[in-house]
């Protein structure tokens, strides 16, 4: 099964089992672009890159309160906004892999740029929660404020356990998340 499918009713099913391994497929600049193209969609992302402080819970995962690179993305399939994604990258990672602070991170996206710099992610944990939409999220996604939205907090770690990326994905209504666990 492809990692994303879009049903005739607009429901997006995200299958995480192969999502990150296929991030550079067809020259894609990350998992979202690759999976959207595989599903027959037209991916687009509006990207802003800044430096600043991560929220306290994200800073705790990253191991400190120092400056981070913040990549804010609005991600579309065609003209439909399907998710908001904010990525927080420690400054030392951005110094080692400067392309992560660029608007265009190249084929394979930030995960590939980190790997190129010797900071390959070998473990990813994604926590899925429901959170009330903030006024800004509600306006962007066309829902009422406080509408419960699925949020995925993605943490990428290196082989030695260092968190090198935390991305918070806030999904528009209509998503199904599918996870598989090998039993061998």
Language-model regions, residue ranges each:
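HTH-adjacent hinge/linker in prokaryotic transcriptional regulators
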Residues: 1-60, 64-65, 94-105, 111-112, ...
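Conserved amphipathic alpha-helical segments that form helical-bundle/coiled-coil interaction surfaces
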Residues: 59-95, 103
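Hydrophobic residues on conserved beta-strands that form the core of alpha/beta folds
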Residues: 44-46, 70-71, 84, 151-152, ...
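C-terminal regulatory/effector modules of DNA-binding transcriptional regulators
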Residues: 63, 80, 91-93, 100-184
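Short beta-strand-initiation
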Residues: 31, 57, 66-70, 136, ...
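Hydrophobic alpha-helical segments, especially N-terminal targeting/anchoring helices
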Residues: 6, 75-76, 157
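Generic short beta-strand segments
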Residues: 49-54, 72-74, 153-155
């Amino acid at each position: 099964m492809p990692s994303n499918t879009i049903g005739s009713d607009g429901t997006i099913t995200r299958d995480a089992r192969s999502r990150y391994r296929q991030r550079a497929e067809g020259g894609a600049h990350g998992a979202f672009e690759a999976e959207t193209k595989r599903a027959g969609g037209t991916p687009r992302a509006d990207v802003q890159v800044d430096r600043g402080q991560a929220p306290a819970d994200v800073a705790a995962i990253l191991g400190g309160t120092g400056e981070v690179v913040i990549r804010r993305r609005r991600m579309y399939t065609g003209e439909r906004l399907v998710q908001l994604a904010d990525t927080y990258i420690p400054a030392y990672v951005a110094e080692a892999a400067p392309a992560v602070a660029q608007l265009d991170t190249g084929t394979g996206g930030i995960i590939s740029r980190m790997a190129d710099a010797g900071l390959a992610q070998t473990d990813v944990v994604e926590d899925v929660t429901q959170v009330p939409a903030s006024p800004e999220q509600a306006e962007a996604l066309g829902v009422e404020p406080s509408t419960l939205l699925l949020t995925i907090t993605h943490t990428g770690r290196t082989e030695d356990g260092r968190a090198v990326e935390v991305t918070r994905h806030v999904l528009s209504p209509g998503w199904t998340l599918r996870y598989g666990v090998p039993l061998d």
